[in-house]
Amino acid sequence: MKKYLVIIVFLFMLAAVLWRAYDVFWLRHRYLITAYCDCPICINVPEFRDGKFANLRPIHWGGVAAAKSVPFGSDVELVPVTLRDLLAVRNFLGGRRHFTVEDRGGKIHDRHIDIFFPQSRGGHQAAVRWGARRMRVKINGRLME
C-alpha cells in the first residue's frame, strides 16, 4: 500500500512540474487581448470618436487595434489556450476568432491586441466584462512567437 502511495505522489508531482513547464512555455508566446468601445472612457481623445477606425473605415464589429508593426488589413486569429479563454471566445465573441486590424491605439504596443465592441455587441459593458486576457495569436495565418 505504501508503495502505491509513493507512486501516486510521484505521479502528481511529475504532472505538476510538466504542467508548469507547459504553462511557462505558452505564457512566453501569449498576447494581451483587451477590449474597447467608442465611448469617452475607452477613447479619451474627442477627435478620435468620429465613428471611424484609424484606417478611415467606419467602425464595425470585427475590427481590432494592433501595434504599428502589424499592417492594416492583417487577419488576426485568437488561439485560446485555456478553457477559460475558450469559453470567453464563445460567450463574449459569439465564437468569432478572426478579426481584421483596422485601428491603432496610444497604449497598443508589441504583443497587444484590442478588440472593438460596438454598441450592438454590448459596447462598454461587454468590453469591461471581457477584461484583459492572454492568448496565443495567429497573424495572417502565422502563429506568433
Describe each PLM feature range:
Residues V6-W19:
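Hydrophobic membrane-insertion alpha-helices, especially the h-region
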Residues W19-E145:
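Solvent-exposed, well-ordered loop and adjacent helix/strand elements within mature globular domains
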Residues M1-Y4:
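Positively charged n-region of N-terminal signal peptides that target proteins for export
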